[in-house]
Amino acid sequence: MDWNVIAQYLPLYKKAAWLTLRLGLAGIVIAIVVGLVCALVQYYKVPVLRRIAGAYIELSRNTPLLVQLFFIYYGLPKIGIKTNAEICGIAGLAFLGGSYMAEAFRSGLESIEPIQTESAMSLGMDHTQTMRYIILPQAMSISVPAFVANVIFLLKETSVFSAISLMDLMFTAKDLIGLYYKTTECLFLLVVFYLLILLPVSLLGSWLERRLRYAGFGA
């Protein structure tokens, strides 16, 4: 292990880690919004939209992210829809993540007993108030373990961004290995930076689960 090489490559990995984190978080935020909308559509059994949401979830979950990225990056320009690599990466991650978030939120919503909705309605709440103040907070709390697992999964999936020439962590590692053959040092830095990104998310998720358990949610 050549520590001088590691010190030399460190700035490149820092830049790549920032790109990975920036695009990953952008895709995850969009995925959360898409997932919540799809979950609510399925929960309320909205005609037509429910079938569209179901078809989207099946398509997204049963095709690899790499294929989705290739379709967006190489396929869409053929029909006149052009975009850059960063937008493509965010869109691909959001498309994949939305389906996983939808299933996490849907399971949380469906775990709430119907009697809670009935009780809220009997107290004079309308459907919007019941969902906002009674159902959704509990469903979100119950969904925390699946939500955190999905966030970690999606951040790890950013490693395929290198396939569309985004200079993320994986691209940087492969590029440096190909140029200088410093395989051990490059892979060591790759592991360290992925741990620096993912370990805090995992620890935060565990802490949040414990807090919610003590507060009485998701028991």
Question: What name fits each language-model region?
Answer:
Residues 1-219:
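Transmembrane alpha-helices and adjacent helix-loop boundaries
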